[in-house]
Amino acid sequence: MSKKNSELKARFRRSPEWKNFRKHMAELYDNKDAITGKPLRKGWNLHHMDMAVENYKDLCEDKYIPLNRASHELIHTAFRYSYAIDKLVYYVQKMEEINKKKEK
């Protein structure tokens, strides 16, 4: 992302329009992280699912989700490696099976 785009986004995030929308979205999700269901922590992110810079100001509820920092990093990583999601699910399930056997 260019420096100019970063500055435009930062300026928009300081606007009352953005701040009100951000608050509205947190309330819409009961002040919980959309992925984990945990309470939103200080510094939480309102994640834009539409990655196009030109759509940054399109404040449509369907294009945003509130996330804590770790979930926000996770969703961006998963997006970059979306081709590997099926493998990730397979290995996580395998880990769960292995660790359930140890609990018995």
Where are these regions (language model features)?
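A generic structural signal for solvent-exposed, polar alpha-helical segments
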Residues: 18, 24-27, 50, 54, ...
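Intrinsic-disorder/low-complexity regions
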Residues: 4, 19, 30-32, 67, ...
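Short Fe-S-cluster ligation motifs
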Residues: 63-74, 94-104
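Short cysteine-rich loop/turn motifs with clustered Cys
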Residues: 17-45, 70
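A boundary/linker detector
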Residues: 1-20, 37-39, 82-104
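Generic alpha-helix detector with strongest preference for long hydrophobic helices that associate
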Residues: 2-7, 27-30, 48-49, 69
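Histidine-centered nuclease catalytic patch
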Residues: 34-66, 75-81, 86
